[in-house]
Amino acid sequence: GHQGVDHIDPELYVRWMQFGAFSPILRSHSTKIAGLTKEPWVFSNEVSDILRGIIRQRYNMVPYIYTMAREAYETGLSLCRPMYYDYPETQEAYDYRNQYMFGNDVMVAPATSPMKDGYTEVKVWLPEGQWYEFASGKTLQGGQVLTRYFALDEYPIYIKAGAVLPMYNDKVMNLNGKDETIVLNVIPGKTSSEFTLYEDNGDDKNYQKEFATTAIHSEKTGSKLTLTIS
């Protein structure tokens, strides 16, 4: 948390950083205590590598996050929202209060308990439909509650089947560049889906009038997937 003990538990710090990567703002600052250092390189090599991966994942997700942030600006619907916003008729949406939607297509079920034998146990409610589990690469059937296990470098992230996720590739080094390559990740499982990518110069208030939107449509017919960008 922001204020408390005068030492940092590496496992807890990693889980906080994972949570931060799927929050509107990722920051690692806290109360000012001499010797309370939080830079990724002050931890063990294993933990430093995990923290580096978390930050890079956040960088990779920026095209999706920035688009969803613009939608929040336009509609007032938060980037992070409780499950009952999207599933108001389902009781589990109220019961599983830790879970939340991160934009329209990503669901997060934070790891909030310490590891046992190298894994954290998380009970996850998956709404109806199919969901892609980021950590395992598996497609899971929704409409049920599952018990899943996550190592320290894994986090409970689920993506709707059929979603189109625009992301930067792994070569992105900072967010100041204007010509970063955007990769479109299409999650299998639906016959068709859409996403409208939002872009502006990211520097000033010109976003109010000067911006670009790109419509992306995916269509699956049998084993053939067609992606249309317009």
Locations of regions flagged by a protein language model:
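Catalytic-domain carbohydrate-binding cleft regions of carbohydrate-active enzymes
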Residues: 1-154, 159-160
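Accessory, solvent-exposed terminal regions and/or long lumenal/extracellular loops of proteins
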Residues: 152-230
